[in-house]
């Protein structure tokens, strides 16, 4: 991580405290009685020419405060002068953050000039009740499988479950692209405990996909102290809040990985000497998660819709970290490697995925009935798989054969060409409106497309595209 060099004004003369004790990433600082900083205030110390930011976590008595370092403490020595900024850590905000990459303290790490614009504190209250919008509203993504089966709530939180190589990054890029184009929205990506290599790859992939200019990236990398990993999600959220509250925009906030936020909080809690709670997690787990998640919401000014990658330790859904996260999620998207192996992207498993917005009162009766019909057909097909594997298709009843044929068409039709993948696939990207998606799947369920081979449903946007491809095939065959 690129560290910021200290300026000449950060001298002993302007200091109002000094390093009293160093315990790894925990630094105790002693102040004069009339100048003790408040909890969450940011302190600055010159560590061999590099600015190290400390965040106040506890008052220890005798004018000593206990802080957590946001950077490496190697080389720090007792007696070094410390400056109280009299403010929390400040995140960069405004239009100038788009296309840029920052660390937890808001310093640029993309080898571009340092950010000099407006900044806001990362610690803020959640919006007041009177500012919230209570009516449920759908955020159209233009991605068929999501809009049909797992509709996003504006200001909602979506959990994204997927291993390596199943298309998680591409799905994130397409969501960023579609929100930017269809809703004139912006996106913020917070890499919490990310591998440095993954963050670097993501940055360059965003450049290649042409979505970087509508995105701001914030990283607290895996090799950084727990303080940086614990606070980087708040830095990203603060950037998103400014776009929502000051620019009245719909913002997409990606947090990868929300488990690392909890993990870093657990490390900090242990370093501060707090008694651990269940499974060794911090006793403040629910409070910390709630203070982050409650700020992600829709207000009368705009919305923040969050997509959060969720790591489940040892696949144990009862583990306190994922269990606490689940209580805040409105929807979950499960990416399945077996679907990806069929060449169907996005590799979303519609049977394992779910959304609380899949409600006839919110999305309408027709959409709800079509989604249930698709779900039921795919479930029946899954139930018949073992019979097909042993006895083959010929042993099925005529009704079951029809279900299998329609299910395979639905499965293929859930595939979609992405704008961000055009240069790799050679297929033009597709943004499909919800109304077109519902109408097209209804035609499959009603048997209007029973005569069309399942292969023609792959990577088509609407039913009209499938019919056109079918007619073109018939013309070719006649020749």
From Swiss-Prot:
The protein's matches in SUPFAM superfamilies, at most eight in alphabetical order, are given as: C-terminal domain of alpha and beta subunits of F1 ATP synthase (SSF47917), N-terminal domain of alpha and beta subunits of F1 ATP synthase (SSF50615), P-loop containing nucleoside triphosphate hydrolases (SSF52540)
Q: Which residues cross the membrane?
A: none
* Bilayer topology: Peripheral membrane protein
Query: Keywords on this record?
Result: ATP synthesis, ATP-binding, Cell membrane, CF(1), Hydrogen ion transport, Ion transport, Membrane, Nucleotide-binding, Translocase, Transport
Q: Where in the cell is it found?
A: Cell membrane
The record's listing under Pfam families reads:
ATP-synt_ab, ATP-synt_ab_N, ATP-synt_VA_C
Which superkingdom?
Bacteria
Say which enzyme class the record assigns.
Answer: translocase
What are the GO cellular component annotations? Answer: plasma membrane; proton-transporting ATP synthase complex
Under HAMAP family, the record lists: ATP_synth_beta_bact
Protein known as: ATP synthase subunit beta
User: In the record, what lineage is assigned to the organism producing the protein?
Assistant: Bacteria, Bacillati, Mycoplasmatota, Mollicutes, Entomoplasmatales
């Amino acid at each position: 991580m690129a560290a910021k060099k200290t300026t000449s004004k950060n001298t002993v003369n302007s200091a109002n405290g000094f390093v009293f004790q160093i315990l790894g990433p925990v630094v105790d600082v002693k102040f004069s009685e009339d100048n003790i900083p408040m909890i969450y205030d940011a302190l600055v110390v010159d560590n061999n020419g590099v600015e190290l930011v400390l965040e106040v976590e506890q008052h220890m008595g005798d004018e000593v405060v206990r802080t957590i370092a946001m950077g490496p403490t190697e080389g720090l020595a007792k007696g070094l002068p410390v400056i109280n900024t009299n403010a929390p850590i400040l995140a960069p905000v405004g239009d100038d953050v788009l296309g840029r990459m920052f660390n937890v303290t808001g310093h640029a790490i993309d080898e571009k000039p340092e950010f000099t614009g407006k900044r806001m504190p990362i610690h803020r209250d959640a919006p007041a009740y009177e500012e919230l919008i209570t009516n449920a509203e759908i955020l159209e993504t233009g991605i068929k499988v999501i809009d049909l089966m797992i509709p996003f709530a504006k200001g909602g939180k979506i959990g994204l479950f997927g291993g390596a190589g199943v298309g998680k990054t591409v799905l994130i890029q397409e969501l960023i692209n579609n929100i930017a184009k269809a809703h004139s929205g912006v996106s913020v990506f917070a890499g919490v405990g990310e591998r440095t290599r993954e963050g670097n790859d993501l940055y360059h992939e965003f450049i290649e996909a042409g979505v970087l200019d509508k995105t701001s990236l914030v990283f607290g990398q895996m090799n950084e102290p727990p303080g940086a990993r614990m606070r980087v999600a708040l830095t990203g959220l603060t950037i998103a809040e400014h776009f929502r509250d000051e620019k009245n925009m719909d913002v997409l906030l990606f947090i990868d990985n929300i488990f690392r936020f909890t993990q870093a909080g657990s490390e900090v809690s242990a370093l501060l000497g707090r008694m651990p709670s269940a499974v060794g997690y911090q006793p403040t787990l629910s409070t910390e998660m709630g203070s982050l998640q409650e700020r992600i919401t829709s207000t009368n000014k705009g919305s923040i819709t969050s997509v959060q990658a969720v790591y489940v330790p040892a696949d144990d859904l009862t583990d306190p970290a994922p269990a606490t996260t689940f209580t805040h999620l409105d929807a979950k998207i499960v990416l399945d490697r077996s679907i990806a192996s069929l060449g169907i992207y996005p590799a979303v498993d519609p049977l394992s995925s779910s959304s609380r917005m899949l409600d006839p009162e919110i999305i309408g009766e027709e959409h709800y009935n079509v989604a249930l019909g698709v779900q039921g057909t795919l479930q029946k097909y899954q139930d018949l798989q073992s019979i097909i594997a042993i006895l083959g298709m010929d042993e099925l009843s005529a009704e079951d054969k029809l279900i299998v044929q329609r299910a395979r068409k639905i499965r293929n039709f859930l595939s979609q060409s992405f704008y961000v993948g055009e240069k790799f696939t050679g297929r033009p990207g597709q943004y499909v409106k919800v109304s077109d998606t519902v109408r097209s799947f209804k035609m499959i369920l009603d048997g209007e497309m029973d005569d069309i081979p399942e292969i023609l449903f792959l990577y088509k946007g609407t039913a009209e595209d499938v019919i056109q491809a079918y007619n073109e095939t018939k013309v070719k065959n006649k020749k």
